[in-house]
Amino acid sequence: YKRQLRRFYGDGCPAAGIVEELYRLGYEAFTKPVPKMAGLDELLAWLDAHHIPMAVASSSPMTIIEGHLDHWQLGHYFKAVISGEHLARSKPAPDIFLLAAEKLGTAPAETLVLEDSYNGVRAGAAGGFVTVMVPDMAPANDEMRRLYTAECRDLYEVLEGLQKGRF
């Protein structure tokens, strides 16, 4: 980056400082706790009360995942926390979900994957998981509708679906 900045803006450009500030801002934005999705507390409590094992399987670095779990005090719910940072293949490959199912002792066809991303839905479907899309930033499209088991508008609807045995 420094070379490119100097090439475009000349030798007087404080490239090192600019790059350092960009990294700092990016890290700050990435590590800032994300807001909890509506219905998360209720869903986790219900799953826990019914002794359903849970895992976090995220492409984010482990330090970020653990930071969010610690911030919201949710770590105790999860039997496994898996980061894709050390896996050979990331989503849309199903590797992270297959590893999570292995750690939970569940078969993919009996394991629910909740996803808000296209690559996550692709990974869940590729691994043979019960894949429920809960769109956040990107709405479901035709490809997602062909791949997922169900779509829920929020985690309250996921909880209702579980309670009624829909998936």
Which positions does each model-derived feature cover?
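A generic structural signal for short
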Residues: 31-32, 53-54, 85, 109
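Short, flexible segments with low predicted structural confidence
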Residues: 18-19, 40, 53, 72, ...
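Asp-based, Mg2+/Mn2+-dependent phosphohydrolase catalytic module
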Residues: 45-48, 62-167
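Hydrophobic beta-strand core positions in alpha/beta domains
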Residues: 55-56, 133
